[in-house]
Swiss-Prot record:
Mostly expressed in seeds, stems, and siliques, and, to a lower extent, in leaves, flowers, and roots (at protein level). Highly expressed in root and shoot phloem companion cells. This is Acyl-CoA-binding domain-containing protein 6. It comes from Arabidopsis thaliana (Mouse-ear cress). Residues 3-88 form the ACB domain. One of its GO terms (cellular component) is cytosol. One of its GO terms (biological process) is response to absence of light. Keywords: Cell membrane, Cytoplasm, Lipid-binding, Membrane, Transport. Its main location: cytoplasm. Binds medium- and long-chain acyl-CoA esters with very high affinity. May function as an intracellular carrier of acyl-CoA esters. Confers resistance to cold and freezing. Interacts with phosphatidylcholine and derivatives, but not phosphatidic acid and lysophosphatidylcholine. May be involved in phospholipid metabolism. It holds the Pfam family ACBP. It comes from the Eukaryota. Disruption phenotype: Enhanced sensitivity to freezing stress.
């Protein structure tokens, strides 16, 4: 399985989490996903009254130095971590 296929698979797996990840984890995933799929952020930063959109933009901007492949690998690693945490909580 190639990197792109594994990335797409983990993008689907994240939807199977039984517990919603923290906002911090969600923003990390968002930034990595956008960087992997679209490359560096290409829009202006949302205004201060659009707090949710601004946080998402900041998360994407934070990873703009990563290549698409690096972002895919980091995304896969993060999803695996979240799945492991969910599995350990389910077994206790």
């Amino acid at each position: 399985m190639g990197l792109k296929e594994e990335f797409e698979e983990h993008a689907e797996k994240v939807n199977t989490l039984t517990e919603l990840p923290s906002n911090e984890d969600l923003l990390i995933l968002y930034g990595l996903y956008k960087q992997a799929k679209f490359g560096p952020v290409d829009t202006s930063r949302p205004g201060m009254f659009s707090m949710k959109e601004r946080a998402k933009w900041d998360a994407w901007k934070a990873v703009e130095g990563k290549s698409s492949e690096e972002a895919m690998n980091d995304y896969i690693t993060k999803v695996k971590q979240l799945l492991e945490v969910a599995a350990s909580k389910a077994s206790t």
